[in-house]
Amino acid sequence: MAGHASWVLAIRFVWLQACLAFMMSSFSRLAVSSKMLATFAWVALLSSCAMATSVAPPVKGNPQLKKDHYVSYDNEKFGYRKWLPKSTAHQDPAIVIIGVHGISGHAGDYDNLAHYLLKHRQDVALYAAETRGQGMDPKECRRGDVRRVEQWYKDLVVFTELVRQEHPKSKIVWFGESMGSLIVMHGYQNARREQRPHAMAISSPIIEVDSELPTWKLLAAKCAAILFPKARISLESLSDGRRPMVTKEDIHEQQAAKNPWYIRRYTLRLLVGLGDLAQSMDQMAPAVSCPVLVLHGGKDFFTQEDKVNDFCKSFNQSIDKTHHYYPGSYHLLMYDHQRVQIFSDISSWLNKMGDHQRSSK
């Protein structure tokens, strides 16, 4: 979970400062003129269209759900956690939540929510997988990087299908927190109709990196990611001395930096990819045809209330949409001081699932 307090800031600074500085410093060491730099940058941008159409041969994987890990579409293995009520010994739970954690987080971030649900009801199970490129990725060289954001969507769909096979009678709910909200929203858009969940919960969504960024700076940042996709940047070095509070007590971030899943440096392509996902969140909402729950704290440094309100309004008016706003809460709602109330609201929303049939278009 470490890095939540700085990853959005990092994307902003990558787009505003870091990428430009990285480009200029790299080329200055090579004594390249500014004219040549500009020419090379535009060539890279124009050629990116061709690069995007170059698709590697598909890998035929053998997806499987093992005791402590699952095998994804490309035979890569990722750990996961599950919290099952005792009732699953003789019947499928009514609802299975599939949680997607935030940046520099891990599957255990859903522990608080899971234990609340296990204590208060016996009809809900929760699964949460480790995200590719994050701190519990078994391949250390891949931590802090992702080749394409589409890999996240594919992993989510595969994991969901494997969980469905375990609980064929259960309704599936995707739950995305922070960066996870980007993955579930875009994953829904990219999934086939039969692969989509019955409902989605969006906690602390990241909506727009910065609407005031000049177009030329956005292009420069994307150019840097094309030229140096695997170059890594420390999030702390980009924070400009700012350390936003992510919970009321604000001790989680200090502790998280000591965790084994903490990532100190991220690649440019991952950060710019996240920025692109955040910028297009509003465009994803109209395609959603299942019930949606949106949770947001009034003291969330990264996304303002009006942005979340606009995001909620962009969903189709025909769907069941619930928006809970907590004026005194911060970004990490599942760790914050109002979490018991938030968990209670989530549980109440889940009660409505029995009134809905699976709806996906």
Sequence positions of predicted segments:
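Catalytic active-site module of serine/aspartate enzymes centered on a nucleophile-bearing elbow/loop
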Residues: P327-K361
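Alpha/beta-hydrolase-fold enzymes
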Residues: M179-T267
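Short beta-strand/loop motif that positions the catalytic acidic residue
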Residues: V288, V294-H296, D300
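Catalytic nucleophile-loop/oxyanion-hole region of alpha/beta-hydrolase
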Residues: H106-A107, G135-S170
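The serine-hydrolase catalytic nucleophile loop
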Residues: I103-H115
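Short beta-strand element of the alpha/beta-hydrolase
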Residues: P93-G102
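An N-terminal hydrophobic leader/cap segment in hydrolases
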Residues: A44-K86
